[in-house]
Amino acid sequence: MDKSDTDWDGFDPEAREEREIGREMVSKSTGLGSVVAHFYRGEMSVVTTWRSRLDETINWAVTIISAILIYAFSTEGNHVILLTGMVVIAVFLGIEARRYQAYDVYRARARMLQENLFANTLDPSQGVEHRDWRRELSEDYRNPTIKTPYVEALSRRLRRIYFPFFALMLAAWLFKLMAFSTQPVLETAAVGNVPGFVVFGVVGLFYALITAVAFWPRERQSKGEFSKVEHGEWKEAE
């Protein structure tokens, strides 16, 4: 058997001296600290890149929503443009949920390092947050996996960003139907040969669906960055 295989068989990433590698980085002068610094810098660079991609999606959504609203109320055009706006927002939501899944992969790695390496380096007395953090991180680099289910990604982006967009578009659509026509609302809501009550039914089902996705209770899988609010208490001198 190769000597390296023998050494690896004896390696236990959950052993105290291995999982608390942050203590070694402070107490001993090794090249490990330099390697980890570059490694962490690279991870944060990827996190920042994916964060900017999320922001780009939001910026495009805001721009298109603004254009649709301006066009819808600057002419006597059909209310269908606002229904189209709802579809456009849904498309952007789907794109952003996919991007959020990728973003969370790299954010989870960065948080794993922050919680178990850097926090332990600053205060070794607290120990690590995850006993097998090195094994988990190693496995994730060998076999990268999505950490957040797609439905949860949709839910988080809906609550944070897109639900207000949908609410704004719904309010604009209803206002357009009621304020810019002398006909009954159900007649005004008709789209071509599709009766108004069918249009209302489809819109109602769609909003019921996104409300359920956004607010249905579920166990969180994504890696959060903030555990609680302290409002500056942490930096007060004793």
Named regions from a protein language model:
Residues I70, S74, L93-Y100, L174-S181, ...:
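Transmembrane helix-loop junctions and nearby membrane-interface residues
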Residues I81-I89:
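Hydrophobic core segments of alpha-helical transmembrane domains in multi-pass membrane proteins
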Residues I89-S138, A212-K228:
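Inner-leaflet juxtamembrane helices
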